[in-house]
């Protein structure tokens, strides 16, 4: 019996053990690492504020300031999980692990249609890609966004395959509902893969009628799910319309003000590295497939016309990628929705490989990812809010009601560990940002025991501010790179 034939039996049972293995793969070690600032701490803090206030419509970072830079779906997911399973890092990250696991299953479902000879292979590739696996263990909007974009792509692929049967309409409606939820997860970026799929649908309009992808019930679900929250909060606060359209959409697209790799080579530096490292251990097959295509540019128009699968994957990947490259705000996780079609491309690229060779590469990738997870859990990084919370809890105060960061970025994840309010104060009397109230006016307010944290560069200015503003203060120690002060009264004595 050949080695490859010996390996076929486990492959035939792939779908039987996929779900338990996938759940173990996605959920294991989720709680071993503390929350990292800024993203994880902020998302969890806003979710906790929803649970505390009961206001699930308007996100807040504390009881004073709203935080509407992102739509609320991620906050809702984290808040629901923490409410159900308790205040633990595992519970906070559970929605993302679940979204990752479901994305793997959806990629596998598309594999049945697009890689029928080995439908399990795209799921295996996606599960062992570096970027989706790493992102599933970091609380941001991107893993949920990738799940919903993959969901609507899978629904439209299935509808196309069933276009001659009655079941296609249900998949189309489900696809539009998923597109609405993608928009509720992150706004306009959630529709970029949809634009690529729309280009593909237009390209085959003579073969598959464009009405296949239209559904009145689906479009209604898309509008209600995708735009309902935006319309509701804008009705109460009309100036949010300009904020959403100008600050959060147009300025991020066209302006370098977000300081996220907006320079000329930022796209190459960020996205080039993300695609090369994020697709490990399948990078080489993808590069070889790309090289083979580029060596014969004259054959590309023929392939575009003759191969619907290649056309679908090209539209799905290239249309969003062009927008991401042109936009002036660039981060690695932005490309996460493109890794589902990349998994399908990689599965085709290794189509001639033996099952044993595929399994060995996937196993090597899995071992590398587990090692990366273990490293992240064992090494305490400066942005670890759990470590900082332990240092603050050891300070000589009877209780902690609020932690205020003076002239430095707040660590909102402390709210998760200390059950205290977290805010940012400014030493300027007229600070530029609404979420930075002046320390001179805030510190005298008796809001329980407030610990003031300041870095060395601003410590002297804070002491001067306190001396003239409240007359007295007390240094109570250090926590990480911060020096801690309190003022008399408020329960800190």
Residue ranges and their predicted role:
Residues 2-351, 355-356, 375, 415, ...:
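Membrane-integral, polyisoprenol-dependent glycosyltransferases
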Residues 465-477:
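Short secondary-structure junctions
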Residues 372-461, 475-481, 485-487:
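Short periplasmic/luminal acceptor-recognition loop of GT-C membrane glycosyltransferases, typified by
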Residues 192, 461-463:
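Extracytoplasmic/secreted cell-surface and envelope-processing proteins
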Residues 349, 357-380:
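Transmembrane alpha-helical segments
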Residues 490-492:
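Extracellular secreted precursors and ectodomains with disulfide-bonded cysteine-rich loops/domains
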């Amino acid at each position: 019996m050949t080695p490859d034939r010996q390996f076929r039996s486990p492959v035939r049972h792939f779908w039987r053990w996929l779900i338990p293995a996938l759940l173990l793969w996605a959920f294991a070690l989720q709680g071993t690492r503390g929350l990292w600032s800024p993203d994880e701490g902020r998302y969890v803090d806003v979710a906790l504020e929803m649970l505390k206030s009961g206001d699930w419509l308007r996100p807040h970072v504390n009881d004073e300031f709203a935080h509407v830079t992102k739509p609320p779906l991620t906050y809702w997911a984290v808040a629901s999980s923490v409410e159900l399973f308790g205040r633990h890092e595992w519970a906070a990250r559970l929605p993302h692990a679940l979204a990752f696991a479901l994305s793997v299953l959806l990629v596998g479902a598309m594999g049945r249609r697009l890689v029928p000879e080995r439908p399990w292979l795209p799921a295996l590739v996606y599960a062992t890609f570096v970027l989706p696996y790493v992102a599933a263990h970091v609380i941001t909007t991107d893993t949920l966004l990738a799940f919903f974009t993959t969901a609507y792509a899978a629904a439209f692929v299935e509808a196309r395959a069933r276009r001659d049967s009655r079941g296609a309409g249900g998949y189309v409606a489900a696809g539009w509902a998923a597109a609405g939820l993608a928009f509720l997860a992150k706004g306009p970026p959630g529709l970029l893969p949809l634009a690529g799929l729309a280009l593909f649908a237009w390209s085959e309009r003579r073969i598959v009628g464009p009405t296949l992808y239209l559904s009145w019930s689906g479009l209604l679900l898309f509008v209600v799910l995708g735009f309902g929250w935006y319309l509701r909060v804008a009705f109460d606060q009309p100036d949010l319309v300009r904020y959403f359209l100008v600050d959060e959409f147009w300025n991020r697209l066209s302006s370098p003000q977000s300081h996220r790799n907006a320079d000329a080579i930022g796209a190459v530096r960020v996205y080039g590295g993300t695609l090369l490292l994020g697709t490990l251990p399948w990078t080489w097959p993808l590069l070889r497939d790309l090289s083979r295509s580029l060596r014969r540019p004259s054959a590309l128009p023929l392939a575009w016309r003759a191969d619907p699968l290649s056309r679908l994957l090209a539209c799905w990947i290239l249309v969003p990628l062009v927008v991401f490259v042109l936009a002036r705000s660039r981060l690695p996780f932005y490309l996460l929705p493109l890794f589902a079609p990349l998994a399908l491309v990689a599965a085709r690229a290794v189509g001639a490989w033996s099952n044993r060779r595929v399994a060995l590469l996937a196993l090597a990738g899995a071992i590398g990812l587990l090692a990366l997870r273990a490293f992240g859990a064992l090494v305490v990084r400066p942005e670890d809010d759990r470590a900082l919370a332990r240092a603050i809890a050891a300070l000589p105060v009877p209780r902690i009601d609020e932690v205020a960061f003076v002239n430095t970025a707040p660590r909102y994840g402390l709210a998760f560990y200390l059950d205290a309010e977290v805010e940012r104060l400014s030493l300027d009397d007229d600070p530029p940002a609404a979420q930075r109230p002046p320390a001179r006016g805030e510190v005298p307010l008796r809001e329980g025991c407030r610990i003031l944290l300041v870095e060395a560069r601003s410590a002297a200015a804070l002491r001067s501010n306190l001396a003239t503003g409240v007359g007295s203060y007390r240094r109570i120690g250090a926590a990480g790179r911060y020096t801690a002060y309190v003022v008399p009264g408020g329960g800190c004595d």
